[in-house]
Regions:
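Signature for the C-terminal beta-barrel architecture of outer-membrane proteins
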Residues: 31-38, 142-146, 165-204
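Transmembrane beta-strand segments that form the barrel wall of outer-membrane beta-barrel proteins
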Residues: 58-62, 148-153, 159-163, 188-195
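Outer-membrane beta-barrel translocator domains and adjoining extracellular loop/strand segments
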Residues: 66-72, 108-113, 157-166, 198-204
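Intrinsically disordered, low-complexity regions
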Residues: 8, 16-19, 23, 37-38, ...
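Intrinsically disordered, low-complexity segments enriched in small/polar residues
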Residues: 1, 83, 188-190
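Cleavable N-terminal export/targeting peptides
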Residues: 1-40, 44
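Short acidic, glycine/Ser/Thr-rich loop/turn "cap" segments at secondary-structure junctions
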Residues: 116-121, 156-164, 171-173
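Beta-barrel outer-membrane channel/assembly domains of diderm bacteria
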Residues: 28-153, 176-181
Length: 204
């Protein structure tokens, strides 16, 4: 099931995972040497894995639409899955990669905007597989985090800028973000967005 959904992304995921784990193990070794500690090869990798994390989530969603403009009702059964890896901070840098898949369950009696079933009302949850997030963050500036790459952006209550979290295909942004928290009770952010990956998927 996982390979069928994420198969074409697994080489990318494995490559990024290997690089991040290698940097984590090297960082752990350097830290141990600087503090006069001794760490075995096995211990270095265990320490690296503990400091980082693979994550997985799945969300089933059902939406029914009764629209008087159509002779048929829409019934959309979909499942969203995320598979990702988030690193700890090493040399001031952390990284994240996340794959996303949206699958229709059953007959797909709804217009997803990409499936051609225009005789049904619209439920904007098209089937899609993509790299949802992949970014690096720099943490060595006091009270500041600089993030570059594909990322989630949710400002305030997400009314104007957000991830459209109630839909299955999450909206993400290819962007540069500088977030500063040096002032009490005030957060400052500069965001440059190159591209918006909308909820309608790659085919729309």
């Amino acid at each position: 099931m996982i390979y069928r959904i994420f198969g074409r992304f697994l080489p990318v995921f494995a490559g990024v995972l290997g690089i991040v784990l290698g940097l984590a193990a090297f960082s752990s070794t350097l830290s141990a040497d600087q503090h006069g500690g001794a760490t075995t090869e096995h211990g270095k990798w265990i320490e690296a894995v503990k400091a980082t994390g693979v994550f997985f989530s799945a969300r089933y969603r059902f939406e029914h639409v009764d629209d008087k403009g159509f002779t048929k009702n829409a019934n959309a059964h979909t499942i969203q899955t995320h598979l990702g890896y988030k690193s700890d901070i090493h040399y001031g840098v952390s990284g994240l990669i996340e794959l996303e898949n949206v699958e229709a369950i059953g007959s797909g009696d709804y217009n997803s905007t990409t499936n051609g079933r225009t005789n049904f009302p619209t439920v904007a949850d098209p089937e899609n597989s993509e790299i949802n997030r992949v970014h690096l963050s720099y943490h060595n500036i006091p009270d500041t985090v600089v993030t570059v790459g594909r990322q989630r952006l949710v400002l305030d209550n997400a009314r104007f800028v957000g991830d459209v979290g109630f839909r299955q295909n999450q909206q993400t942004f290819d962007a540069l973000t500088v977030a500063n928290s040096s002032l009490p009770d005030l957060g400052l952010a500069y965001v440059y967005v190159k591209q918006i990956l909308r909820i309608f998927g790659d085919d729309n």
